[in-house]
């Protein structure tokens, strides 16, 4: 009987492990790994969609390949900001070259990894938006830079410090349509003073956060609204602090919430997202 109970428990544990693995597979089926250099080959070997940051714009205003390993076929292409000291730029010419490169490599989409909302970037993105739409190639643009575009899919960071992640995503879907909202899974690890005058705290490394937890003996909690963990502590001067952070379990929970909102594409940096590609405890 003891042996039967042991075998029974073993089967239950095995079943739970399989269920967890299948659940993570469901939530990661639309996960796109963002890579540079040699990481691209490693990520592609996992059988996941890959975005390769491999294109830029030269000071002379031409589309150029960055100094990375060979561009992989069937990967999404990533193009970075143009240099601020650019001499001349024909947005339409660069857009046409981008369409050519996407077709040449059979890329399923293009990600404009633009960080600055400048007049030049707005002209470039408008040209990309029309050219890629006409070519039936999806264009992904960070929300802050692409909100005025007509066709691009807007990528929204999950690193929020207030409100509700699902309500935030749902509100944007209501404005732009669900098909035009994607997400960028951006881990957060920040220390805020209370009350906090800004939505951004002081960035903490994982090691610094672990040391702070050990030093203060604080108890972490999970916020369902932010879909992140947090703890509070008092510093030596009696100032209250609030630490908000992600780990593999909260990133997996974010994927689940995004899937529940109907988000079709979620980008995540590799190898930072490697922990999502295995079952969570």
Region roles according to the model:
Residues 257, 261-264:
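Conserved, well-ordered alpha-helix/loop/beta-strand core segments that scaffold catalytic motifs
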Residues 26-160:
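Chitinase-like catalytic core of GlcNAc-active glycosidases
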């Amino acid at each position: 009987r003891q042996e039967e109970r042991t075998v029974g428990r073993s089967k239950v544990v095995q079943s739970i492990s399989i269920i967890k693995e299948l659940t993570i597979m469901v939530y990661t089926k639309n996960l796109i790994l963002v890579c540079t250099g040699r990481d691209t080959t490693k990520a592609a070997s996992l059988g996941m969609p890959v975005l390769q940051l491999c294109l830029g714009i030269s000071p002379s205003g031409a589309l150029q390949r960055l100094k990375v390993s060979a561009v992989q076929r069937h990967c999404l292409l990533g193009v970075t900001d143009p240099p601020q000291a650019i001499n001349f730029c024909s947005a339409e010419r660069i857009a046409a070259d981008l369409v050519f490169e996407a077709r040449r490599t059979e890329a399923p989409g293009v990600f404009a990894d633009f960080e600055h909302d400048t007049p030049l970037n707005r002209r470039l993105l408008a040209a990309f938006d029309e050219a890629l739409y006409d070519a039936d190639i999806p264009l992904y643009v960070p929300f802050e830079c692409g909100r005025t575009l007509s066709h691009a899919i807007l990528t929204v960071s999950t690193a929020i410090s207030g409100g509700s992640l699902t309500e935030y995503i749902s509100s944007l879907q209501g404005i732009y349509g669900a098909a035009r909202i994607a997400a960028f899974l951006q881990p957060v690890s920040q220390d805020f003073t209370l009350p906090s005058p800004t939505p951004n705290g002081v960035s903490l490394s994982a090691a610094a956060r672990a040391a702070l937890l050990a030093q203060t003996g604080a108890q972490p909690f999970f916020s369902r609204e932010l879909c992140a963990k947090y703890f509070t502590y008092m510093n030596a001067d009696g100032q209250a602090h609030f630490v908000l952070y992600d780990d593999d379990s909260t990133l997996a929970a974010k994927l689940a919430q995004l899937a529940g909102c109907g988000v079709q594409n979620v980008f995540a940096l590799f190898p930072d997202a490697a922990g999502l590609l295995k079952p969570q405890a």
